[in-house]
Amino acid sequence: MSVDGAVLGSVRHRAYANFNFGHEPPLDSLGEAIRRVAAQAGITLDSQPVAKVGLFCLAGADLPLDDRRITRQVKGRSWVDDVMLRNDTFAILRAGTDRGWGVGVVCGSGLNCAAVGPDGRIVRFPALGELSGDLAHGGGWLGRAALGAALRGRDGRGPHTSLEKMVPEHFKVKRPESVMEALYTLELDSQRMLELAPIVFKAAAGGDVESRRLIDELADEIIATANAAIRRLRLTRLTFDVVLGGGIFRNHDGAFTARIRDGINAVAPGATMRRLDAPPVVGAALLGLDALKAKPAAKERLRKELAKTPLASRR
């Protein structure tokens, strides 16, 4: 991307891309994506930087110690002159509003929130699951909770639920116990629990009470997280945007969205919910233009070009 907002190349490279502490950093995958997008722009990725500024909005950049660690790792590759690191939640927020501040909530495999006040103050959360006090932690939690509800319905510890049938059917087995055993013996990758999130929404749409309870629990955690950021930044009496991004928000469950809207508006009546309809990479690119003090016309051009430019060479 040039400073005037022209898109010089775009790529979606599907690979493990979480920089969580304790995992091997996926620098090679990131480097491959940079190499491919640079090639589209006619730039050779070698020992020389390919751009003046690199704005990296990365999953796993959750704590200040993560910011320092990942920045060192990325700087070591000499891809760009100036490395600017943000959590991926900031890309969601920037892609969804041009105010320059507000609240961004991402709910995909996990749940996280970042908020920026009109004075530039920032609130963010560790988003480390139970370790950081999180309760209903995104789509991964919803999938695991669905399996738990199915098991409890079967053995009598909980109410009967259509998940008793729908969960095993999704994995082409007869009983939820078979799913549990496959997870226990590592025959089934635990990441596949994410596949159950849409199943829960489908069951709730069909009137399943237990599925609706789980969805409400997730909505309430989203509300609690967003409202905590709103209160800490003293936004309760202001007008601002709350941007909702991530796979969980790409559903057609009106009750889920309404519950979140009502819960946040009870604390901040001037908050407007905006479901993100642009790729989060738009937010990262706009943050880069913000850092370069680009003109508004450049940012408008970037939005328009990325809206009509497919992410090439998808894998």
Report each predicted region and the residues it spans:
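ATP-binding/phosphotransfer module of carbohydrate and carboxylate kinases, centering on a glycine-rich
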Residues: 1-45, 49-51, 75-76, 95-101, ...
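Alpha-helical substrate-recognition element adjacent to the catalytic core
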Residues: 29, 57-62
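Conserved helix-loop-beta element of the AMP-binding
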Residues: 53-55
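Solvent-exposed beta-strand sheet faces enriched in polar/charged residues
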Residues: 57, 86, 241-245
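Phosphate-binding/catalytic loop of phosphoryl-transfer enzymes
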Residues: 61-165, 311-315
